[in-house]
Amino acid sequence: MAISYLPAILVPVIGLVMPIFCIVFLFLYIEKESLN
């Protein structure tokens, strides 16, 4: 039963988490580069 609801939960989670993860990764990368 829970498997049918999985895509409905994963799509918004991935849509929110992935951009945040990318922004944080880029921010940390830029900060690291600017320190050197």
Swiss-Prot record:
It comes from the Eukaryota. It holds the Pfam family PSI_8. The keyword Thylakoid applies. It is found in: Plastid, Chloroplast thylakoid membrane. GO terms for biological process: photosynthesis. It is a single-pass membrane protein. InterPro entries: PSI_PsaI, PSI_PsaI_sf. Its main location: plastid. The chain crosses the membrane at residues 10-30. GO terms for cellular component: chloroplast thylakoid membrane; photosystem I. SUPFAM superfamilies: Subunit VIII of photosystem I reaction centre, PsaI. Keywords: Chloroplast, Membrane, Photosynthesis, Photosystem I, Plastid, Thylakoid, Transmembrane, Transmembrane helix. May help in the organization of the PsaL subunit. Belongs to the PsaI family. This is Photosystem I reaction center subunit VIII. It comes from Cyanidium caldarium. The lineage of its organism: Eukaryota, Rhodophyta, Bangiophyceae, Cyanidiales, Cyanidiaceae.
